[in-house]
Curated annotation (Swiss-Prot):
EC class name: hydrolase
InterPro entries linked to this entry: Creatin/AminoP/Spt16_N, Creatinase/aminopeptidase-like, PepQ_N, Pept_M24, Peptidase_M24B_aminopep-P_CS, X-Pro_dipept-like, X_Pro_dipept
Any one GO molecular-function label of the UniProt entry: metal ion binding
Descriptive protein name: Xaa-Pro dipeptidase
Alphabetical list of CDD domains matching this protein: Prolidase
Cofactor binding description: Binds 2 manganese ions per subunit.
Needed cofactors: Mn(2+)
Annotated source species: Shewanella baltica (strain OS195)
Length: 440
């Protein structure tokens, strides 16, 4: 924790600098950042799992306590209004006592509806950042999630501080242990549901604590991009395993994917080819490179794999131009990663939030930025046998370029995705996932 404490001072200084800058531009007195409120299920007395506002947890690792507030102006010591009710029904959060508390003036709030007593008196000139606009209106905020402030903060969130990078390394380190446990469970005959339990136990986090719903897909289920069903029974024949799963550390996410074949076969060879391509793409990352160019390079590699593995005929550029590669690789190469799995700022050209759209032929690409130092991105090329997409090729002449016999052979395996989390440095790339132990 000493290293985090060392980096945290500079982290808070940078956040204060950003706040002071945007407040000066927008002639605002400060920001009031709301952690959020519980959401109750319809016609029930149970709340949905609480997820803190990412703008709130950017400042401090208070992740599970609703009704907290931050009052910041970039000059004075930030004020944390920490919710600690008198409650004999539920576990009440302890008063914070960690390395970060010295950087905040902490006030305890015992009743959520009394927060106005702790807020600035000239509230009309402060901006509210949060989800609950109705609460903000009642409290008197006239500026609620102003576009200029949000665009500025989102643009700069893509540049991680050293504190944030260390948190993300630790999130990767934790997730790697889960992936190794899940891989072992797969080869020992576990079902999807059982593999999930092995993963969660290894990372020491519940389903509500990991940053997103894990994808644990055996066999043809791997062709479903966001598969989260978790079958309880093991398949009669074990062919393949795709796992897309991360972990959290102090509010920062990791997002890692691996694919395994149960036996040595053509699908296993395809995994090896995809792994090689993914590492080559990561080697292409450097400051000044356009992320969409990396995505297009991925399609060239996928096209070559289609040719090499007798899935399609033709030439590389023709397979791309006709949209054939998009039927096998329909999603984007990756995205920004940080406080959110699909972190903000991936389309921001500048501090004003000028939007750079994804290429028309690749609408699912989640990042169009030019790479810069201290950005963290996922790199996750894939190749899948998705019948709904491949059937579209059958409707025209493109279907004649597909070797449907090979498609039929690979269909039971579902698909492949390999995903690492990479820090772009000025002079190198840091592949956190591989360097922390998930080498295959």
């Amino acid at each position: 924790m000493d290293q985090l404490a060392h980096h945290y001072r500079a982290h808070i200084a940078e956040l204060n600098r950003r706040v002071a800058e945007i407040l000066s531009r927008e002639a605002l007195s400060g920001l009031v950042i709301h952690s959020g409120q519980p959401h109750r299920m319809f016609l029930d007395d149970i709340n949905y799992p609480f997820k803190a506002n990412p703008h709130f947890k950017a400042w401090l690792p208070v992740l599970d306590n609703p009704n907290c507030w931050l009052v910041v102006n970039g000059r004075d010591k930030p004020q944390l209004i920490f919710y600690r009710p008198v409650d004999f029904w539920h576990k009440v959060s302890d008063v914070p006592d960690m390395f970060w508390t010295e950087y905040f003036d902490i006030k305890l709030l015992t009743k959520a509806d009394k927060v106005a007593e702790f807020l600035p008196t000239d509230i009309a000139n402060w901006a509210y950042l949060g989800e609950h606009l109705d609460v903000a209106e009642v409290l008197g905020f006239t500026s609620r999630n102003p576009d200029a402030v949000m665009s500025y903060l989102h643009y700069h969130r893509t540049t991680k501080t050293e504190y944030e990078l260390e948190c993300m390394r630790r999130a990767n380190q934790i997730a790697v242990q889960g992936h190794l446990a899940a891989k072992n469970a797969f080869y020992n005959g576990a079902s999807e549901f059982e593999i999930q339990q092995h993963y969660l136990s290894a990372v020491g986090q519940s389903e509500n604590e990991v940053p997103y719903g894990n994808i644990i897909a055996l066999n043809q289920n791997a062709a479903i991009l966001h598969y989260t069903a978790l079958e309880h029974q093991s398949p009669a024949k074990r062919l393949s395993f795709l796992i897309d799963a991360g972990a959290s550390y102090f509010g920062y996410a990791s997002d890692i994917t691996r694919t395994y074949a149960f036996e040595k076969n053509r699908f296993d060879e395809l995994i090896t080819a995809m792994n090689k391509a993914q590492l080559e793409l990561i080697d292409m990352m450097r400051p000044g490179v356009r992320y969409p160019d990396l995505h297009l390079a991925t399609h060239a590699k996928v096209a070559q794999m289609l040719l090499d593995f007798d899935l399609a005929t033709g030439d590389v550029q023709g397979l791309i131009d006709q949209g054939i590669t998009s039927a096998f690789f329909p999603h984007g190469l990756g995205h920004m990663l940080g406080l959110q799995v699909h972190d903000v700022g991936g389309f921001s050209h500048d501090e004003r939030g000028t939007h750079i759209a994804a290429p028309e032929a690749h609408p699912f690409l989640r990042c169009t930025r030019i790479l810069a130092p201290n950005q963290v991105l996922t790199m996750e090329p894939g190749l899948y046998i998705i019948d709904t997409l491949l059937n579209e090729l059958k409707q025209d002449s493109r279907g004649q370029q597909i070797n449907w016999q090979t498609v039929d052979e690979l269909r039971p395996f579902g698909g492949i995705r390999i995903e690492d989390n990479v820090i772009v440095h000025q002079d190198r790339n840091e592949n956190m996932t591989r360097e922390l132990g998930l080498t295959d």
